[in-house]
């Protein structure tokens, strides 16, 4: 039975019949139009309140997950219940009108009495339904019902393509009046219905002053059997299902295929519905919350009661309305009788029908319809209401009876305006603003209180769309604000200034054309140009703005320009204009021809006989000749600059005149125009190709300029980074997009504004750690203050998810226009791509496209790339590069393009498309040009359809969701997949098997080698070797490894470089988002944690923080709290949070997180000395046991390994944190943490992990000062390495070891050995093709080379570092490069890259998220700049950069970069102290003591590393000499010299020697010593070529004040 029912439902005729009443389906109508049919029946009008409010609530919802589908479910939940009741009781649903419906019981007149009883019973049961249901979505849904009975007439009308029907007559008027009288839950009977019903069965309540009555309840006699009565009544209904069909709600569900009937019924159904039925798409596909324009037309007739009269009038009106709407892709949605009139509900912008300039077309259509219908003599009054906005467009009703309808406040507003403002075309403010028509086309109407509309806003009358010469009203539309800068358009203004200069110098015509899409800010550019042009003396700028209507008015542009030139724009009366004209043309034109100006300038010169005989063409020529003379006369007196906005609307005659004008006299014309929609006329083409024309295509604003714009628009000094990213990405650099996105955020109250606080006052927590805001450029600060000295900052409301926000209606409309202009296949491709995300690969798109082959897809993609829907990229590096820079403004050389032969153009286009196809084949990554398009297309899918496609995407991506092949496809969080069951439960077995083989669900053979070995270690270092011999042996070992890597690369060296960074963006992040969409929160959490871990590995703390935020939201949604996998995810989450906190220098938070993680991993870390002592004893015994163990146990299970690796990671961070603290007992905690890391790593039985632990343990003992212990563990590392096979991961272990040992040796001051090891590590990592590691080793190698003054080698390393930073687009390596360049300038006496270049890099990148949230590097850069300015004694600049550095000082991390940065910062503070002492500042001594304490603290810290001691002692010596403490100065200076000698630190030793010489000699330095030195610093190239002389090192960077040490005394400081 169900199969049969499904077969019936799939029939096209059944689907069509579901949109129509039985009255039409089974009707027999004559082919004449109009045709009339009369019958008797009962009408029920049901009005449902609450739907409009619900539609508004959904249409203004913030997030994309609250869309049309949810709304249609709620609407149909109620409406289908009503429809079902009506059908069960034998009714026929005639029409759905938004949130109301009209039902009919068609019977003979003698049956009316009984049928009314049935209908009343049905009405009461409908009310009962709603009383039982709870309010949905917080809205109270209630119904009002009106009933009428009597004589009904049906009118069928239309044209050859579409038919419509109406029911008219007294009963129809009565039923509407009855419903209007009803209150909530009332049933009202019309007077006639009350007359015809069985009064004995009905209890009523009288309505005062009305003949209609209200039904209270039915009161059947005790013996009354309603079922028998109902069955009897249904026998009189022609199409009530009975017998074999009694289980069907409607007989129309059983219709057999009948092509003739189907063709007939199709005429009653909208075209988009028929398309949906033909495409066999799911019901509901057309349900959307969609921006549309509603045109409500109401016709009132002179003889309302005569069907034949109104029938012909409606027919005439309908045919005309249909023809007008067809031109502009509008459609009639409903036609019904409405309060004594006939109403047409017309809609522009239905799915698939969206067109540009929709609002203008709607108004144009409305005016046309109004003009036509007003001429139909049988129509008394025509009233039209036009409203624009988001409404619900969708199929509403029951599966067996439904209609496509529109619901929303805008529908109501259009309907109310139509009734409250009769006899005119009225529109709302949104339509008025969106039309972009001149204000003089409209007149504001007085406000009226309209039923059901709380605040419609201003209402306007549309006066007509024929352009009139409104002198003084065609100025540029936008305003120029003195306090608002023109942002991001420097280049465009430069083009104007340059062209202007040429115009003035050559006295030759110039044309400057700015082409740009709507929203690019063309009008703003012209407004600025008008202002600049008017600043020059003897220059006259005439600026006008055209509209869409201007194009259709002959000679309109010249007419307006000449009116301005002649000064007519300021005249208040035609007589004044006439006098002005007479004075200007009397010498140029015979008086008898003055009347030539009558029409064009609205004057009244007497018409001469000669003029009346003149032909139209001759008049035009005379007029043009006169204008030429006037202009020739004017340009002799002053320079004329014509400025024309929206020049695409210049009419053809005006173009021809302009073309002639620029050839005849020197004139400067500036135009802005949107790209021509059609081929421009010959004259326009000629101007574009003229040698004196400069044609500029406007680019978008750059990210920094968008940031500036937002800060200026909001009047704030900073905005959140998340908001900045959202607006930069969402706007694509288009000013209008940015403004609309901001308005949308403001509308949803997402933005908060507060007084700016200093950063020192803010307590750092996890939630505010990354709330460092982005600021506008310095020159914008002036425009961002709310008042003098007061600044506000912008924040986001807590919990808001910007990326999930639904796009603003205005921007959605732009995307819908573009989508609807595409073919259906292209639309499908774009919608499928939208499911994948903003960025996607061709492989994944092909996977989810239904029934496409690769050739079809490539061809479609090429077209869409050409149409600027997608951008394509060969690699993720290209993508990242493109995202950093928006398309800039550029000049188009149409003259050279025009040289191509016309015959070749078509061929060229085809060739271009073929080239694009080839490019798409090569490019595997694509991205939506506009994120708004992706969001808009995504919202068009149904929930179930989305789920199917998200699942397809997830299954495809899972196979690659791990590290790249280069990194052996492992997890970013070691052994993560062993803990969390993320794949197997949802995938088929073939996929599972494939994934097992590709991803290593079991440990592969190579991993097994490193994880366990049954054989005892073969190699041991002989005990009698000296340190030198061991050193040579180690270096020789690494040399051998490098030799073997070079000699057999195929076995050892990976074929491709690391691709992990790319995989994060195109695989793992999209996969996490697909799982979020599928509500698979545990899987989504897994991948967000993987992402966070990966970004921490890549040094991107901000992204790690953001994805941990996503993870935290998902963790809160998980319910199975007792599962081990969830516990592990919590532990991972806390450990990753700890790592972020550690990197940001928030050690207290980091420690707290690590303790939480270890507790969840069942490794509680002691929190008091008693448990510490006990745990220390346990761990020492464990370590002894592991170290003395000769054979290893069986392999460790994957789950256990995951746990151990995470524990080891936590302990590694913990000992570093404890090492930072001075408290004596903290070193024991640090020692315990280091030992626990060691034991945990040994338990893994993995060589790589064990070697890492040995190296960590060695470093810990180095820094803690345990001289003998560290050596033992370094030997153990080498013994471990010597026992590994030379392949795969073992090579990486060896490279890692060389690199880490080199780093440790550098920290400890063994600079020669650090260089030896670093050089070998560099060669190994370069062969292993891992950019991240290669970058790190180059950075590390540069520092010992710098301190050893080995500049030739250093410059070579810097060259490699620069090449890497450019190739990989790596900001960290580029920043480090400039840091070393600054060091070279400050300390080495030559220039490798200029100071200006370094400073520019900092200015452009200081807000980069990797640098901003990386501890040390930005601190170092700021501090170096501050030191430079301090030496130049430019103290304002010094303070600026020193203050920036100061904010970063608090991020204390035990890293080399931090100590490099802090030592530069301290140097700046010491130089500032010198200034204070010279100026005898009051707090100088306090500052000196504070600086000395800070330096002593740095030296005392375990984590600092001896390599920094010489510099720190040097600074301490200088502070002492400044403060008059010669004894301490000697001590610190000598200590620093000894350490420099020991380390081989030639650079510091040289500086110390010079300081000693200067401080203890009688020599004096001049104040501008450093300035003189700066000016004579040689470049590296000059030094190499021998032209630069010696490097400048004959000066000291510390120039003590000009007074002897003995003169310093305590009172002076006070």
Curated annotation (Swiss-Prot):
It is an enzyme of class 4 (lyase). One of its GO terms (cellular component) is apical plasma membrane. Binds 2 magnesium ions per subunit. Is also active with manganese (in vitro). GO terms for biological process: cAMP biosynthetic process; epithelial cilium movement involved in extracellular fluid movement; intracellular signal transduction; spermatogenesis. Expressed in testis. Hydrogencarbonate binds at residues 95, 167, 176, 337. It is a peripheral membrane protein. Its EC number is 4.6.1.1. ATP binds at residues 47-52, 99, 144, 406, 412-416. Mg(2+) 2 binds at residues 47-48, 99. It catalyses: ATP = 3',5'-cyclic AMP + diphosphate. Its main location: membrane. The N-terminal guanylate cyclase domains are required for enzyme activity. Fragments containing the first 470 amino acid residues are fully active. Belongs to the adenylyl cyclase class-4/guanylyl cyclase family. PANTHER family: ADENYLATE CYCLASE TYPE 10 (PTHR16305:SF32), TESTICULAR SOLUBLE ADENYLYL CYCLASE (PTHR16305). This is Adenylate cyclase type 10. It comes from Mus musculus. The lineage of its organism: Eukaryota, Metazoa, Chordata, Craniata, Vertebrata.
């Amino acid at each position: 039975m169900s199969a049969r029912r499904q077969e019936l439902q799939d029939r096209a005729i059944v689907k069509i019949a579901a949109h129509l009443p039985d009255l039409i389906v089974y009707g027999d109508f004559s082919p004449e139009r109009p045709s009339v049919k009369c019958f008797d029946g009962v009408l029920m009008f049901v009005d449902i309140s609450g739907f409009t409010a619900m539609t508004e609530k959904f249409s203004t919802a913030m997030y994309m997950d609250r869309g049309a589908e949810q709304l249609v479910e709620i609407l149909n939940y109620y409406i289908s219940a009503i429809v079902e009741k009506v059908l069960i009781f034998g009714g026929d649903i005639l029409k759905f009108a938004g949130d109301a419906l009209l039902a009919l019981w068609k019977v003979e007149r003698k049956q009316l009495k009984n049928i009314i009883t049935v209908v009343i019973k049905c009405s009461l049961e409908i009310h009962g339904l709603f009383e039982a249901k709870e309010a949905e979505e917080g809205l109270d849904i209630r119904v009002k019902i009106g009933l009428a009975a009597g004589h009904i007439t049906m009118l069928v009308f239309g044209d050859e393509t579409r038919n419509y029907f109406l029911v008219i007559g007294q009963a129809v008027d009565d039923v509407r009046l009855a419903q209007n009288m009803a209150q909530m839950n009332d049933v009202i009977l019309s007077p006639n219905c009350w007359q015809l019903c069985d009064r004995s069965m009905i209890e009523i309540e009288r309505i005062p002053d009305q003949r209609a009555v209200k039904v209270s309840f039915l009161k059947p006699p005790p013996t009354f059997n309603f079922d028998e009565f109902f069955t009897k009544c249904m026998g009189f209904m022609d199409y009530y299902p009975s017998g074999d069909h009694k289980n069907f709600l409607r007989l129309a569900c059983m219709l057999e295929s009948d092509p003739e009937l189907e063709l007939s019924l199709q005429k009653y159904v909208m075209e988009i519905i028929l398309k949906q039925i033909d495409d066999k798409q799911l019901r509901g596909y057309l349900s959307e919350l969609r921006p549309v324009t509603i045109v409500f037309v109401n016709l009132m007739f002179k003889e309302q009661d005569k069907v034949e009269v109104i029938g012909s009038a409606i027919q005439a009106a309908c045919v005309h309305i249909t023809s007008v709407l067809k031109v502009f892709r509008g459609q009639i949605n409903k036609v019904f009788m409405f309060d004594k009139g006939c109403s047409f509900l017309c809609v522009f912008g239905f799915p698939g029908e969206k067109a540009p300039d929709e609002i203008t077309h709607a108004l144009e259509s409305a005016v046309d319809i109004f003009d036509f219908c007003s001429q139909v003599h049988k129509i008394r009054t025509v009233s039209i209401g036009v409203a624009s906005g988001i409404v619900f467009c969708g199929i509403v009703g029951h599966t067996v009876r439904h209609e496509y309808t529109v619901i929303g406040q805008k529908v109501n507003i259009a309907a109310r305006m139509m009734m409250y403002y009769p006899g005119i075309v009225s529109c709302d403010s949104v339509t008025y603003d969106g039309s972009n028509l001149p204000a003089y086309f409209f007149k504001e109407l007085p406000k009226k209180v309209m039923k059901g509309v709380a605040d419609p806003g201003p209402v306007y009358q549309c006066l007509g769309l024929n352009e009139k010469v409104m002198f003084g009203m065609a100025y540029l539309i936008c305003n120029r604000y003195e306090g608002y800068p023109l942002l991001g358009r420097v280049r465009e203004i430069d083009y104007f200034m340059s062209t202007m200069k040429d115009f003035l110098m050559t006295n030759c015509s110039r044309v400057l054309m700015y082409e740009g899409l709507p929203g690019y800010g063309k009008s703003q550019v012209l407004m600025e140009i008008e202002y600049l042009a008017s600043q020059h003396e003897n220059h006259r700028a005439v600026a006008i703005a055209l509209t869409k209507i201007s194009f259709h008015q002959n000679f309109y542009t010249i007419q307006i320009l000449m009116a301005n030139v002649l000064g007519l724009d300021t005249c208040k009366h035609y007589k004044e204009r006439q006098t002005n004209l007479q004075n200007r043309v009397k010498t140029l034109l015979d008086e008898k021809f003055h009347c030539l100006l009558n029409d064009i300038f609205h004057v009244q010169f007497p018409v001469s006989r000669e003029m009346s005989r003149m032909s139209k063409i001759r008049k035009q020529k005379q007029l043009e000749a006169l204008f030429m003379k006037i202009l020739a006369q004017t340009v002799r007196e002053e320079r004329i600059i014509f400025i024309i906005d929206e020049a695409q609307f210049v009419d053809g005659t005006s173009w021809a005149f302009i073309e002639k004008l620029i050839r005849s006299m020197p004139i400067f014309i500036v135009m802005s125009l949107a790209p021509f929609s059609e081929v421009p006329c010959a004259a326009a083409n000629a101007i574009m190709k003229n040698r004196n024309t400069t044609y500029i295509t406007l680019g978008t604003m750059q990210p920094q300029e968008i940031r500036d714009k937002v800060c200026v628009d909001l009047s704030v000094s900073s905005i959140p980074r998340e908001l900045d990213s959202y607006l930069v990405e969402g706007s694509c650099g288009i000013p209008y997009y940015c403004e609309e996105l901001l308005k949308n955020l403001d509308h949803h109250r997402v933005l908060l504004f507060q007084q700016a606080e200093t950063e020192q006052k803010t307590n750092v927590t996890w939630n505010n750690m990354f709330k460092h805001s982005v600021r506008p450029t310095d020159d914008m600060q002036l425009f961002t203050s709310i008042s003098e000295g007061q600044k506000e900052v912008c924040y986001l409301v807590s919990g808001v998810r910007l990326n999930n926000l639904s796009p603003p209606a205005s921007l959605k409309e732009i995307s819908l226009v573009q989508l609807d202009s595409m073919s259906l296949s292209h639309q499908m491709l774009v919608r499928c791509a939208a499911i994948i995300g903003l960025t996607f690969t061709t492989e994944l798109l092909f996977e989810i496209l239904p029934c496409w082959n690769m050739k079809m897809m490539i061809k479609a993609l090429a077209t869409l790339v050409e149409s600027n829907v997608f951008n394509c990229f060969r690699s993720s590096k290209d993508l990242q590069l493109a995202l950093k820079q928006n398309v800039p403004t550029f000049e188009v050389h149409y003259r050279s393009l025009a040289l191509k032969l016309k015959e070749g153009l078509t061929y060229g286009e085809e060739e271009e498309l073929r080239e694009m196809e080839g490019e798409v084949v090569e490019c595997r990554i694509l991205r939506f040009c506009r994120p708004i398009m992706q969001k808009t297309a995504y919202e068009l899918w149904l929930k179930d359809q989305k789920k199917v496609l998200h699942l397809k995407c997830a299954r495809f991506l899972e196979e690659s969701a791990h590290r790249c092949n280069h990194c052996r496809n492992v997890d970013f969080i070691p052994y993560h997949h062993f803990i969390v069951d993320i794949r197997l439960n949802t995938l088929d077995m073939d996929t599972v098997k494939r994934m097992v083989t590709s991803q290593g669900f079991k440990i592969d053979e190579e991993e097994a080698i490193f994880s366990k070995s049954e054989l005892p270690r073969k190699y041991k270092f002989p005990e009698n070797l000296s340190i030198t011999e061991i050193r040579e042996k180690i270096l020789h070992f690494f040399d051998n490894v490098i030799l073997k890597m070079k000699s057999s690369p195929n076995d050892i060296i990976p074929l491709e470089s690391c691709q992990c960074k790319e995989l994060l963006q195109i695989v793992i992040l999209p996969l996490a988002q697909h799982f979020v969409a599928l509500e698979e929160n545990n899987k989504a959490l897994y991948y967000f944690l993987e992402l966070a871990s990966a970004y921490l590995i890549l040094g991107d703390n901000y992204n790690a923080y953001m994805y941990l935020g996503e993870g935290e939201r998902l963790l809160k949604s998980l319910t199975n709290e007792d599962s081990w996998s969830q516990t592990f995810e919590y532990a991972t989450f806390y450990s990753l949070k700890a790592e972020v906190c550690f990197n940001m220098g928030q050690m207290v938070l980091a420690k707290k997180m690590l303790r939480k993680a270890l507790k969840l991993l069942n490794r509680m870390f002691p929190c008091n000395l008693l448990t510490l002592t006990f745990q220390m004893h346990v761990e020492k015994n464990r370590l002894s046991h592991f170290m003395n163990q000769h054979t290893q146990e069986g392999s460790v299970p994957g789950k256990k390994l995951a746990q151990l690796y995470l524990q080891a990671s936590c302990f590694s961070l913990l000992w570093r944190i404890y090492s930072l603290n001075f408290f004596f007992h903290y070193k024991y905690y640090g020692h315990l943490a280091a030992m626990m890391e060691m034991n945990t790593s040994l338990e893994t039985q993995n060589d790589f992990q064990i070697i890492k632990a040995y190296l960590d343990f060695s470093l810990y003992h180095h820094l803690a000062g345990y001289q003998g212990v560290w050596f033992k563990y370094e030997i153990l590392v080498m013994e471990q390495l010597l026992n590994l096979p030379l392949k795969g991961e073992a090579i990486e272990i060896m490279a890692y070891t060389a690199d880490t040992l080199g780093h440790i040796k550098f920290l400890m001051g063994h600079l020669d050995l650090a260089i030896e090891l670093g050089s070998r590590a560099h060669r190994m990592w370069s062969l292993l093709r891992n950019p991240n590691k290669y970058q790190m080793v180059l950075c590390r190698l540069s520092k010992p080379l710098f301190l050893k003054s080995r500049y030739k080698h250093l410059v070579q390393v810097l060259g490699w570092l620069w090449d890497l930073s450019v190739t990989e687009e790596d900001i960290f390596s580029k920043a480090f490069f400039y840091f070393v360049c600054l060091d070279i300038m400050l300390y080495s006496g030559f220039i490798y890259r200029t100071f200006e270049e370094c400073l520019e890099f900092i200015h452009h990148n200081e807000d980069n998220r990797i640098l901003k949230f990386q501890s040390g590097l930005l601190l170092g850069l700021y501090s170096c700049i501050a030191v430079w300015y301090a030496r130049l004694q430019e103290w304002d600049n010094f303070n600026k950069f020193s203050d920036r550095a100061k904010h970063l000082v608090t991020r204390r991390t035990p890293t080399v970069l931090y100590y490099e940065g802090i030592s530069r910062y301290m140097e700046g503070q010491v130089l500032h102290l010198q200034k204070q002492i010279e100026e005898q500042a009051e707090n100088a001594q306090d500052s000196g003591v504070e600086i000395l304490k800070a330096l002593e603290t740095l030296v005392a810290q375990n984590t600092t590393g001896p390599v920094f001691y010489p510099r720190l002692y040097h600074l301490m010596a200088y502070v002492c000499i400044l403060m008059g403490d010669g004894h301490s100065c000697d001590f610190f200076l000598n200590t620093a010299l000894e350490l420099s000698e020991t380390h081989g630190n030639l650079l510091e030793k040289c500086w110390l020697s010079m300081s000693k010489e200067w401080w203890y000699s009688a020599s004096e330095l001049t104040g501008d010593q450093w300035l003189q030195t700066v000016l004579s610093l040689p470049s590296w190239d000059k030094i190499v070529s021998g032209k630069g002389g010696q490097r400048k090192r004959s000066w000291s960077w510390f120039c003590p004040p000009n007074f002897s040490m003995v003169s310093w005394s305590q009172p002076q400081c006070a």
